[in-house]
Design a protein with these regions (language model features):
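Alpha/beta-hydrolase-fold enzymes
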Residues: 2-116
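Short, conserved loop/helix-junction motifs that constitute active-site signature segments
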Residues: 7-8, 145-150, 176-181
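Short acidic (Asp/Glu) and glycine-rich catalytic loops that position anionic groups and cofactors
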Residues: 97-103, 151-152, 189-190
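Histidine-bearing beta->alpha loop at or near hydrolase active sites
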Residues: 159, 186-193
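Conserved alpha/beta-hydrolase "acid-adjacent" motif
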Residues: 162-171
Length: 193
């Protein structure tokens, strides 16, 4: 949009825990992506919606698979949280138990993702890293982050994030080579992941 001088350009850009460049401080997901391809992901993660549900037969990345993958990244802390919840209920600490329930009500609220969107995202972000390599296209044109010269950029990361490691979101600032430093801001929250 900046390259075209579009009136639809955003007033600012804010990225929250976004894997802008997984080659920066690579973690488990980046290592796995190094040997994955579209066909492997398709075989393992893409499933048809069961016949008894609306959308039957549509290919999706099931929310339950995503939830299992999320939980497996920090399984020990989830187990500890569930044990603590049981103890809180047993000992009558219902305020703490309610906080647990509120968190997991939201955490467990995952939806199926269309196969097309999921596969395209995996390919562009994790397998091919098209944005940091300057290969990402939109409507047939290469995305040119160097054209961004006056749109403030703000990145936010969690220091303990085990999915988007610290620095991967901040890397967005490196793509905007013509954006003045005073328009680039980053924040890392300690203890959050």
């Amino acid at each position: 949009l900046s390259a075209e001088g579009s009136v639809c350009r955003p007033a600012s850009m804010t990225f929250l825990a976004s894997p802008m460049d997984i080659r920066v401080n690579p973690g488990l997901i980046a290592r796995i992506a190094g040997y994955m391809n579209r066909y492997m992901v398709y075989a393992v993660a893409i499933h048809p919606v069961p016949l008894r549900y609306p959308g039957r037969g549509r290919l999706v990345y099931p929310g339950m698979v995503q939830l299992g993958n999320f939980m497996s990244l920090s399984l020990r802390s989830h187990i500890e949280s569930h044990v603590q919840y049981t103890q809180d209920v047993y000992h009558g600490r219902f305020d703490d138990a309610d906080k647990f329930r509120d968190f997991y009500d939201e955490y467990f609220s995952v939806l199926d993702c269309t196969a097309e969107f999921y596969l395209e995202t995996l390919e562009n972000v994790f397998i091919d890293q098209t944005l940091p390599k300057g290969l990402l296209t939109y409507e047939g044109k290469k995305v040119d982050c160097a054209a961004i010269t006056d749109i403030p950029l703000f990145t936010v990361e969690g220091a303990k994030d085990n999915m988007v490691n610290e620095g991967q979101c901040q890397a967005a600032a490196n793509f905007c080579v013509n954006l003045p430093d005073e328009l680039k801001e980053s924040y890392v929250q300690d203890g959050v992941g």
